[in-house]
Amino acid sequence: MSAPGPYQAAAGPSVVPTAPPTYEETVGVNSYYPTPPAPMPGPATGLITGPDGKGMNPPSYYTQPVPVPNANAIAVQTVYVQQPVSFYDRPVQMCCPSCSKMIVTQLSYNAGALTWLSCGSLCLLGCVAGCCFIPFCVDALQDVDHYCPNCKALLGTYKRL
């Protein structure tokens, strides 16, 4: 017996593997710029015969240029972030959102829930001779509205209850 020799190729047509498609072909990277449609092929002679039998040139096809975005154009937008202001029973220094000036707020006192609860409590305790209306004279029991001294806009309210 003879020793087995080197491997030999199988008989028949040899198949050479082809390379896979490129990334651009697979994903379509250039999909941002659509390719114009291919022109329709004309007759092989290059001349088209008209209704009167005379030869005419084939129509020419024009493609529109693809717009290229300007890489140098940068839009700059300034954003101002204003911190939320906490309103209490004292004036607040702030920038007015209406007139855009730096101001110290003016205060206005109004009867709120704490004022009415105090009045009702005093009435139940027996202060019916007008003493139950004392909370309407005490600023510490009323709600506080903050106004801009320039444009008189209401900026915020401090509610005690």
Swiss-Prot record:
Phosphorylated on tyrosine residues in response to EGF. The PPxY motif mediates interaction with WWOX and NEDD4. The LITAF domain is stabilized by a bound zinc ion. The LITAF domain contains an amphipathic helix that mediates interaction with lipid membranes. It interacts specifically with phosphatidylethanolamine lipid headgroups, but not with phosphoglycerol, phosphocholine, phosphoserine or inositolhexakisphosphate. Residues 76-160 form the LITAF domain. Induction: Up-regulated in macrophages exposed to lipopolysaccharide (LPS) (at protein level). By estrogen and lipopolysaccharides (LPS). A motif (PPxY motif) lies at residues 20-23. Detected in brain, heart, lung, liver, spleen and bone marrow. Detected in myelinating Schwann cells in sciatic nerve and in bone marrow-derived macrophages (at protein level). Widely expressed. Highly expressed in liver. It is a peripheral membrane protein. Disruption phenotype: No visible phenotype. Mice are born at the expected Mendelian rate and are fertile. Mutant mice display altered responses to nerve crush injury, with higher numbers of macrophages in injured nerves five days after nerve crush injury, but at later time points macrophage numbers in injured nerves are normal. Bone marrow-derived macrophages from mutant mice display increased migration in response to CCL3, but not in the absence of CCL3. Mutant mice show dramatically increased survival in response to a dose of lipopolysaccharide (LPS) that causes rapid death of 40% of wild-type mice. InterPro entries: LITAF (IPR006629), LITAF_fam (IPR037519). This is Lipopolysaccharide-induced tumor necrosis factor-alpha factor homolog. One of its GO terms (molecular function) is DNA-binding transcription activator activity, RNA polymerase II-specific. GO terms for biological process: cellular response to lipopolysaccharide; negative regulation of non-canonical NF-kappaB signal transduction; positive regulation of canonical NF-kappaB signal transduction; regulation of macrophage cytokine production; response to lipopolysaccharide. Residues 111-134 are annotated as: Membrane-binding amphipathic helix. The gene is Litaf. GO terms for cellular component: cytoplasmic side of early endosome membrane; cytoplasmic side of late endosome membrane; cytoplasmic side of lysosomal membrane; cytoplasmic side of plasma membrane; Golgi apparatus; Golgi membrane; lysosomal membrane; nucleoplasm. It is found in: Cytoplasm; Nucleus; Lysosome membrane; Early endosome membrane. Monomer. Interacts with NEDD4. Interacts (via PSAP motif) with TSG101, a component of the ESCRT-I complex (endosomal sorting complex required for transport I). Interacts with WWOX. Interacts with STAM, a component of the ESCRT-0 complex; the interaction is direct. Identified in a complex with STAM and HGS; within this complex, interacts directly with STAM, but not with HGS. Interacts with STAT6. Plays a role in endosomal protein trafficking and in targeting proteins for lysosomal degradation. Plays a role in targeting endocytosed EGFR and ERGG3 for lysosomal degradation, and thereby helps down-regulate downstream signaling cascades. Helps recruit the ESCRT complex components TSG101, HGS and STAM to cytoplasmic membranes. Probably plays a role in regulating protein degradation via its interaction with NEDD4. May also contribute to the regulation of gene expression in the nucleus. Belongs to the CDIP1/LITAF family. Zn(2+) binds at C96, C99, C148, C151. The keyword DNA-binding applies.
